[in-house]
Amino acid sequence: MKIVIVLALVFFAGILAAGLFNIGLSATNEMEFCTNCHSMKIPLGEYQESLHYKNASGVRATCSDCHVPKPFVPKMIAKVMASKDVYHEILGTIDTPEKYEAYRWKMANAVWDKMRASNSRECRSCHEWDQMD
């Protein structure tokens, strides 16, 4: 009887942990999380002027659509790698427009390198290459 209770507790704890894990994943994919917790006011303004934000179709890409892989393992790797953003937020690496501009090329190259490494997987989740000019 005692083993049944322990197994039931482990089972329900596992369900709770999985639920909390999924809530955390979902929350960290929200635009508000990215733009409120990070020094991302400059890229937010640029994004809001882009076709990914405003377009005739009314479809809007969010931060996670372009920056977070859909497959589980690459997504987990991206989440772990993004922890460096917290470190740089604490340091104030890009907390002013001047610092952002000084660091922009390095950040852009890092994103382009990821795109090359994944064969633009995140772009292809929305775009059809043969329909792009």
Residue ranges and their predicted role:
Residues 1-133:
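Short sequence/structural segments immediately N-terminal
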